[in-house]
């Protein structure tokens, strides 16, 4: 039974607009072979706990009084699960019928596989079917073959990623033909089936990465330990764009992104690299601010990003007050330059 092998862990934060349809999509994908779902909530105020409590079936609610971040919420679900595999996902994701079973089987065939995903397509509306040739008419999929670095982040803030989305030195991903087995450096943050023992071995997600870069950090630590990550065309994963943080990005989430990227750099590339990246990215943002003010009359200003860098510098590389909503998880040091940040293990 799938329930003996896989637990679905989904993180919610005021997600009632998508949660009812999420449960239906899981039911469709696991028809006749249901598995347990753990709803890990980060202090929602939209009645999600009552809604889950009224549902029948293999459902459990793991609530938290405040928002502790995406990775910290996933950690609660991974710890509570008792199956050898866990599916970590957003509530705006759908997987084709039988897909969970296919991914579990795929990983069972590869003992060193720590994580696997189907081929992911990002859409505005859920398709009526999961026909691969319709969702991927060119037969190509975008997968990660590298990790974020100062060049990819400079291209992000300068806009070069938008103009040249397929240049390998500007982005950490490439497009390749869809096939049964694609070894990758990281999985898409919206979905992945993971070997629970491997996650426990490396210490789960780093709670200091409140939002963004948590999957990059996890993937890098898994591969450092000798584990493998894969994307397979055995199943299709649909992510509905327009409902998550990337689509509703606000000034708050943009500042969280800044802090997470520098913490990731500090953790894996060292202090000197991170400070060099800090000033290089700040310089690019400065040029962007000047252009918007002088040429576009202040429209689309990046001044809040520029000001964050100044405040962080005055803090000695700390996280400026207000960056992490509600202060985040108790006892967690979010300062990106903190000397206690360990290197990858």
Question: Positions of the model-derived regions?
Answer:
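Acidic donor-binding/catalytic loop of UDP-sugar-dependent glycosyltransferases
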Residues: 47, 71, 93-106
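Short aromatic/hydrophobic "clamp" motif used to bind/position activated sugar donors
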Residues: 86
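Glycine-rich, basic loop-to-helix element that forms the pyrophosphate-binding segment
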Residues: 63-81
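A short, conserved alpha-helix in the catalytic core of glycosyltransferases
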Residues: 177-179, 185-236
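Short, well-formed alpha-helical segments that are part of the catalytic scaffolds
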Residues: 15-30
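Non-catalytic, C-terminal membrane-associated alpha-helical segments of glycosyltransferases
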Residues: 252-260, 271-345
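Acidic/His-rich active-site region of diverse nucleotide-sugar glycosyltransferases
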Residues: 105-202
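A conserved acidic beta->alpha catalytic loop
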Residues: 25, 41-49, 66
């Amino acid at each position: 039974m799938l329930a003996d092998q896989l637990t679905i862990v989904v993180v919610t934060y005021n997600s009632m607009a998508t949660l009812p349809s999420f449960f239906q999509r899981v039911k469709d994908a696991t028809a006749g072979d249901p598995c347990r779902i753990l709803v890990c909530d980060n202090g929602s105020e939209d009645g999600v706990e009552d809604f889950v409590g009224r549902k029948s079936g293999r459902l459990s609610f793991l609530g938290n009084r405040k928002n502790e971040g995406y990775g910290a919420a996933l950690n609660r679900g991974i710890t509570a699960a008792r199956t050898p595999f866990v599916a970590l996902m957003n509530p705006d994701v759908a997987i084709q019928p039988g897909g969970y079973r296919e991914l579990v089987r795929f990983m069972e065939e590869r003992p060193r596989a720590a994580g696997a995903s189907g081929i992911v397509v990002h859409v505005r509306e859920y398709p009526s079917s999961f026909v691969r040739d319709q969702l991927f008419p060119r037969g190509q999929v975008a997968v990660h073959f590298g990790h974020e670095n100062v060049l990819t982040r400079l291209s992000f803030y300068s806009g070069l990623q938008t103009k040249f989305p397929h240049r390998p030195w500007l982005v950490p991903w490439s497009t390749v033909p869809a096939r049964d087995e694609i070894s990758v450096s990281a999985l898409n943050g919206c979905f992945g089936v993971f070997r629970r023992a491997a996650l426990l071995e490396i210490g789960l997600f780093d709670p200091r990465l409140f939002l963004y870069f948590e999957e990059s950090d996890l993937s890098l630590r898994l591969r450092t330990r000798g584990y493998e990550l894969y994307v397979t065309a055995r199943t299709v994963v649909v992510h509905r764009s327009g409902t998550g943080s990337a689509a509703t990005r606000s000034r708050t989430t943009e500042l969280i992104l800044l802090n997470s990227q520098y913490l990731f750099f500090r953790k894996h590339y060292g202090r000197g690299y991170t400070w060099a990246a800090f000033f290089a990215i700040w310089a690019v943002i400065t040029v962007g601010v000047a252009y918007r003010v002088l040429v576009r009359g202040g429209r689309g200003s990046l001044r809040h990003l520029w000001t964050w860098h100044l405040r962080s510098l005055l803090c000695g590389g700390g996280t400026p007050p207000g960056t992490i909503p509600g202060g985040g998880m108790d006892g967690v040091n979010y300062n990106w330059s903190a000397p206690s940040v360990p290197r990858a293990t």
